């Protein structure tokens, strides 16, 4: 039962944080496309690790990540207003490059397949 509730809390916090980033943050440094990939709220609901995937060049990624980290207090307050929990979790923003890593592996596999096709001819 507790696992089920934790999963629901994670998904609800993820949905609200995505909405806050998309609609409510007005920071001009957030220029790249940002998506929240995962949220892990601790069992005591004191902390929430928010994994974000940022698309763009390296400079805009760094600026966007810094802007999100500096906006974590605002995000926390908004989550507290929107979701009724015993504690409003402290938001910890972390970069998630798993999507880019997956795309890189796909490109390597495509190159290997091309080389095999070329060698077989």
UniProtKB/Swiss-Prot annotation:
Gene Ontology BP term (one): maturation of SSU-rRNA
PROSITE patterns for the chain: RBFA
Principal subcellular localisation of the protein: cytoplasm
Key words of the record: Cytoplasm, Ribosome biogenesis
InterPro entries: KH_dom-like_a/b, RbfA, RbfA_dom_sf, Ribosome-bd_factorA_CS
A molecular function (GO) term: ribosomal small subunit binding
Recorded superkingdom: Bacteria
Subcellular location: Cytoplasm
Keyword Cytoplasm carried by entry: yes
Pfam families noted in UniProt: RBFA (PF02033)
Record's keyword annotation contains Cytoplasm: yes
One annotated Gene Ontology cellular component of this protein: cytosol
Family in the record: Belongs to the RbfA family.
Description of how the protein assembles with itself and partners: Monomer. Binds 30S ribosomal subunits, but not 50S ribosomal subunits or 70S ribosomes.
Function: One of several proteins that assist in the late maturation steps of the functional core of the 30S ribosomal subunit. Associates with free 30S ribosomal subunits (but not with 30S subunits that are part of 70S ribosomes or polysomes). Required for efficient processing of 16S rRNA. May interact with the 5'-terminal helix region of 16S rRNA.
PANTHER family given in the database record: RIBOSOME-BINDING FACTOR A, CHLOROPLASTIC-RELATED
This protein's name: Ribosome-binding factor A
């Amino acid at each position: 039962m507790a696992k089920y509730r934790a999963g629901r809390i994670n998904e609800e916090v993820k949905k609200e944080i995505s909405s806050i980033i998309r609609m409510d943050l007005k920071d001009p440094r957030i220029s790249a496309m940002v998506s929240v990939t995962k949220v892990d709220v601790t069992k005591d609901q004191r902390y929430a690790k928010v994994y974000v995937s940022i698309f763009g060049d390296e400079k805009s990624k760094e600026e966007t990540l810094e802007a999100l980290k500096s906006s974590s207090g605002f995000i926390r307050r908004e989550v507290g207003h929107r979701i009724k929990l015993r504690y409003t979790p402290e938001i910890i923003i972390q970069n998630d490059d798993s999507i880019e890593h997956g795309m890189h592996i796909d490109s390597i596999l495509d190159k290997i397949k091309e080389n095999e096709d070329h060698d077989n001819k």
